Amino acid sequence: NMEKFGKLTGRYYKPYQYVGAPDAEKVVVMMGSGAETTEEVADYLNKSGEKVGVLTIRMFRPFSVKMFAEAIPQTAKVITVLDRTKELGAMGEPLYEEVSASIAEARNSGLLPRSFDPVVIGGRYALGSKDYTPAMAKGVFDNMSAATPKNHFSVGIIDDVTNNSISYDESFKLDDPTVLSAVFYGLGSDGTVGANKNTIKIIGHETPNFAQAYFVYDSKKS
């Protein structure tokens, strides 16, 4: 179980894990690794005086209304549910529909007070293998601050068909003095990719540092 895993690894996870202000007014609900990016942005915003949080769903099936109700802050006024899929023909994406139904179920069964009536909006992110960046996560929180938040939006892709994508500041970055980032450009067959792959392996194996690399190839031939 998760408790045993935590004791063995030092990493403790819950099926429904909330991170953020205990009295958050804006909450993002999502699954997957993108939640960690959103948590970092939430921490930044909380230090700036906002009241936000992130609820990570690690157990989608069976979905536990009780665990969800225990994890969600009852101070939430706006909840954004992010799905990494587009469900054509449905009223919303799977997690969005699950959260909306769970809030209603929890209120009817007494797990949440009937006064708990947040605005629940849905969004899609990282579609088409797009990156999900801190700038996009901040855009999601900014959308919740609007007088009329955009619902069923996309972030990261400019939706010129339905015009339902939200804008964000692409220059926004989370600066961490303990992190070193670098961008390397190379031409075809010049050895840049191979050299960087070996560099990352050396850093990861021979030092106590954590290393990550991401490579992008265009269609031009060498």
Identify what each model region corresponds to:
Residues G32, A42-D43, F63-Q74, G92-P94, ...:
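Short glycine/threonine-rich loop-to-helix capping motif typified by GTGT followed
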Residues F68-E87, F215-S222:
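A structural-propensity feature for long, helix-poor, extended segments
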Residues V29-R58, T178-S222:
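Anionic-ligand anchoring segments at beta-strand to alpha-helix junctions in alpha/beta enzyme folds, i.e.
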Residues N1-Y18:
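Conformationally flexible catalytic loops at phosphate/diphosphate-handling active centers
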Residues Y18-D23, A71-Q74, L111-R114, A147, ...:
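Solvent-exposed alpha-helices and their adjacent loops that cap or buttress functional pockets
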Residues Y13-Y18, M67-A69, D169-L174, A182-F184:
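Generic recognition of flexible, low-complexity loop/linker segments
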Residues V78-D175:
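Peripheral docking tails and interdomain loops at the edges
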Residues S48-V78:
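Core nucleotide-handling region used for phosphoryl-transfer chemistry
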